[in-house]
């Protein structure tokens, strides 16, 4: 089995089936959004593994580290040379091979919805749709103040509630899917993980 086939299989195991879409927010939706918001607000830090499918179909894997509010780090395994760090204000995208760094405002990415200090999906008017399948829920949200910045779809296992995957559609319409595994929540993380440093040439 090749590495690429293994990664594809790992991601497929976490991908979710087709969901029926709720026509409008129901009482069940409101309760679930409150439950999801409470779950996310209960996460101070998280670490684990990820498998990513880029907009071009390229598969990558690595480790991620998250500290709310506003901080996340993706360490990609070779051959992907990327390192992505959000420091609460900016997202730094490193190319470790070329030793370059690009910065974009965190607020211009849909990930800010997941990383904000306090999540309130029921009352922020951010949720576009809620979808359900046996044992799974999928919530698609946008920033209501910046609707053109794209969307994030968060996929949760139910009972117990756990974030398993997110799908980001950026403002160019490009889709990136990230599936999570072996997560640990509320662990001690080095603050330096979330420091954007100019690359040394």
Residue ranges, per PLM feature:
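N-terminal export leaders
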Residues: 3-7, 11
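N-terminal signal peptide c-region/cleavage motif recognized by signal peptidases
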Residues: 17-20
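Cleaved targeting-peptide boundary
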Residues: 23-31
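A short, Trp-centered hydrophobic/proline-enriched beta-strand micro-motif
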Residues: 38-55
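Short, solvent-exposed helix-to-loop capping segments enriched in aromatics
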Residues: 40, 108-122
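Extracytoplasmic
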Residues: 43-45, 59-61, 67-69, 79, ...
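An acidic-aromatic
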Residues: 63-113, 176-177, 182
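Gly/Pro-enriched, hydrophobic low-complexity segments
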Residues: 122-126, 132-201
């Amino acid at each position: 089995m090749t590495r690429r086939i293994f990664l594809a299989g790992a991601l497929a195991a976490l991908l979710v089936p087709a969901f029926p879409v709720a026509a409008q927010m129901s009482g069940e939706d409101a309760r679930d959004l409150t439950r999801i918001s409470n779950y996310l607000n209960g996460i101070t830090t998280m670490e684990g593994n990820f498998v990513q499918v880029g907009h071009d179909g390229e598969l990558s894997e690595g480790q991620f580290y998250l500290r709310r509010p506003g901080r996340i780090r993706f360490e990609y395994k070779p051959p992907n040379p990327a390192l992505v760090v959000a420091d609460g204000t900016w997202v730094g995208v490193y190319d470790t091979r070329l030793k370059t760094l690009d910065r974009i405002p965190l607020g211009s990415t849909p990930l800010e919805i997941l990383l904000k200090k306090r999540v309130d999906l029921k009352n922020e008017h951010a949720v576009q749709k809620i979808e359900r399948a046996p044992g799974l829920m999928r919530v698609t949200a946008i920033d209501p103040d910046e609707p053109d910045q794209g969307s994030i779809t968060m996929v949760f296992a139910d009972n117990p509630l756990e974030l398993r995957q997110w799908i980001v559609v950026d403002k160019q319409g490009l889709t990136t899917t990230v599936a999570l595994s072996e997560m640990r929540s509320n662990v001690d993380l080095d603050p330096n993980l979330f420091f954007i440093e100019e690359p040394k040439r």
